[in-house]
Regions:
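Short, low-complexity, intrinsically disordered N-terminal peptides in bacterial proteins
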Residues: 1-4, 213-214
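Short active-site neighborhood of thiol/selenol oxidoreductases, capturing the structured segment around
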Residues: 4-16, 25, 43-46
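C-terminal cap of thioredoxin/glutaredoxin-like
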Residues: 9-10, 22-34, 112-214
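The canonical Cys-X-X-Cys-His
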Residues: 15-18, 185
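Glycine-/small-residue-rich active-site loops that bind phosphorylated ligands and cofactors
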Residues: 16-17, 102, 193
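Structural alpha/beta surface segment adjacent to cysteine/selenocysteine redox centers
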Residues: 23-133
Length: 214
């Protein structure tokens, strides 16, 4: 008899720790599949808009972080820390290539459409493409034309995409993790892990959630 493991992931596209956490989760899931092939995993992605007050057209990336962290040196140290963690999971983040801090409401609404109409493969493709658009390609995640092209590249129906994009001026109802921030993982709706932890930590949390499944 198969067992079930639900994984709720709370994230934002502009958070590098969320991309790093996604990679760690993938490694943990592969180990779970190898050691526990009877477990059926159900992933649920929940968008958290960290900066809802960012202008719809976005703001300059460098200026945003200079103001947020107070100095060029503080920004450099923070980015170095992130790059080191990203490299450990084979993710290359070139902050010098990122020009815009976007408003992510439309991107999250697009993902909500994908969750409603897409397959698990399409959902993951869209997640990867949206992360890549921001961290690797310097594309504006608040631009509807960019989002249309991204969704089309993942195989979504053009009419469904256009209908979704036509409603993107509506407010985005962001998920809430309280003071836990993102990434935030909940396993089987009972065991939570906050932050971008190593894959082994996530794997052990999965095993514990399965043991306490009842």
């Amino acid at each position: 008899m198969s067992r079930h493991l639900t994984v709720d992931i709370f994230f934002d596209f502009i958070c590098p720790w969320c991309l790093i956490g996604k990679r760690q989760l993938q490694v943990a899931l592969l180990k779970l599949k190898e050691n526990n092939p009877d477990v059926e995993v159900i992933l649920s992605w929940h968008g958290v808009q960290l900066l809802p007050h960012i202008a719809a057209e976005g703001v300059p990336f460098d200026a945003f972080y200079q103001q947020r962290l107070g100095s060029h040196e503080a920004v450099r140290m923070r980015q170095s820390q992130v790059r080191q963690a990203a490299n450990a999971v084979d993710v290359d983040i070139d902050f010098s290539n990122i020009k815009l801090m976007p408003n992510t409401a439309k991107a999250h609404q697009l993902l909500a459409m994908a969750i409603q109409f897409g397959t698990a493969t399409q959902i993951d493709q869209l997640l990867e493409r949206l992360f890549s658009a921001y961290f690797h390609l310097s594309e504006d995640l608040g631009n509807s034309e960019n989002l249309l092209k991204i969704a089309q590249s993942c195989g979504f129906d053009t009419d469904v995409i256009n209908n979704t994009l036509g409603q993107l001026n509506q407010p985005f109802n962001s998920a809430n993790t309280g003071s836990n921030g993102v990434p935030y993982f909940i396993f089987n709706q009972r065991l939570a892990v906050a932050g971008a932890h190593p894959a082994e930590t996530l794997y052990n949390a999965m095993l514990e959630a399965l043991v306490t499944q009842g």
